[in-house]
Structure formats: structure tokens, C-alpha cells
């Protein structure tokens, strides 16, 4: 999502293209905090200006999202702990439950052996 919000070039273009047809973005409840953390890191590393980060945060706040709590997915997230982070596991567990494809640019998730859903990079 951060790529789609602020990254120029092919990575950002792929993210924006993948998100464009979606009316509602289905995400874990932590989505806003996670994106904010990613933007903060980019600003601290000098990869993003404060102004562009503020614009991206406004986009996140205005995005139509369906947010899901952690608790219903906790057991599955725990099962995935050996191959991906808890945070990534939440996205995987949610995609599995929704019987949908998880789009991610995260190589660790793309190459993980635990997910039962399709995991693909945005194209």
C-alpha cells in the first residue's frame, strides 16, 4: 500500500494499478498504524518528504476500507509464525478466510511456504 501511495516508477505504478478497481480495501485493523509506520521510516531515511507523507496519510484516512480485528485470526497467525511475521500473517490469514489472492510486494511473504491463499506481486 505504501508503494501505491508514494513510490514513483514501476513499483508504485503496479500498486496503483492493483488498487484501482477495488471499491473497498479489505485490511487488518492495524492498517492505518502500519502504513503510518512505513511512511515514518521513509521520511527518516530521506526517501520521502514530510509533505508527501502528509498527503499519503490523508489518502489512507479517506480510503474506503473494511477493517478486521485480530482475534478471529490469532490461531492461524500463530501457525504461520515460523515463515512470516505476525503482521504479515494477519494479512495472509485474512486472505485465506476471504478465499482471495493476497497482493504484496514483500518478498518474504511471496516466498513463504505457509500461506494457503494465493500470494502474488502487484503487476
Residue locations for each model-derived region?
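Residues that scaffold the ATP/ADP-binding catalytic core of kinase and kinase-like folds
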Residues: 4-5, 38, 112-113
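Short active-site oxyanion
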Residues: 23-25, 65, 96-101
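Acidic, PIN/NYN-like endoribonuclease modules and their adjacent C-terminal/linker elements
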Residues: 80, 92-123
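Short, well-structured N-terminal submotif of metal-dependent ribonuclease cores
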Residues: 1-31, 42-51
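Acidic catalytic patch
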Residues: 29-32, 52-82
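Alpha-helix capping/helix-boundary segments
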Residues: 1, 31, 73, 91, ...
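Short beta-strand scaffold positions
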Residues: 27, 86-89, 104
